[in-house]
Amino acid sequence: MAQKDITTVLSMTYKPGEKLMVDFAGDKLPYIDPETGETAKAEVFIGCMPYSDYIFACCVPSQRTEDFLFALRLCLEHLGGVPPIVVPDNLKAAVITPDKHEPGLNKALQDMGNHYGFTVLPCDPGEPTQKALVEDAVRITYNRIAAKLRGRDIVGLLALNKAVEEQNVMLNQTRMQKRPYTREERFHAMEKPQLKPLPEQVFEMRYYADL
């Protein structure tokens, strides 16, 4: 599905500020571990506000629950508010047992939802259109960022995230094809005013024996 087709479908399907779609990219980004000097690889978390196609990306060490929730927290802080619905693509850190009617959610993610005031609605495994839209948006974002960083020797995860942030800003501020606005302009005009305020207290993850 072409980028312009994805954007058109997303903006037609979703209400402003209603949903945040989140997933990890299928591929990782390399960086140099400052302690060992060896090449390490980071997981790339990507969040997308589908109405505006506004993107947030950051890197974390793994797809473990604590890293996923940390990335999600950074995403919400970047957005400056909370959408009522968060849609994970059946990540293991988010969804324990995928099911169309009653998916088994990770307890820590449920705790986070209660803290921030959002509902978790995983992608319907039987709805290929929604799943394809999320995966395509993630793939396109990753490819654009990875292409810009290719060949650079980036030392440390903090430096990698700084480089990713720079490319993320450029992506959101680039005029979209056949549209008179950028992702950033549309997000701030149409979506951010609809978001609920962030809670005063930062979410702290509770650990469960069965996580």
Spans of model-derived segments:
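Alpha-helical scaffold elements adjacent to nucleotide-binding pockets in ATP/GTP-utilizing enzyme cores
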Residues: 71, 108, 112, 133-141, ...
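Acidic/histidine-rich, metal-coordinating catalytic segments
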Residues: 81-101
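Mobile-element integrase/transposase regions
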Residues: 1-55, 66-67, 204-211
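Active-site-proximal acidic segments at structured loop/helix or strand boundaries
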Residues: 138-211
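Active-site beta-loop-alpha junctions of metal-dependent nucleic acid enzymes
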Residues: 57-82
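RNase H-like two-metal-ion nuclease catalytic core shared by retroviral integrases
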Residues: 88, 99-100, 120-143, 160
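Two-metal-ion acidic nuclease core segments, chiefly of the RNase H-like superfamily
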Residues: 102-120
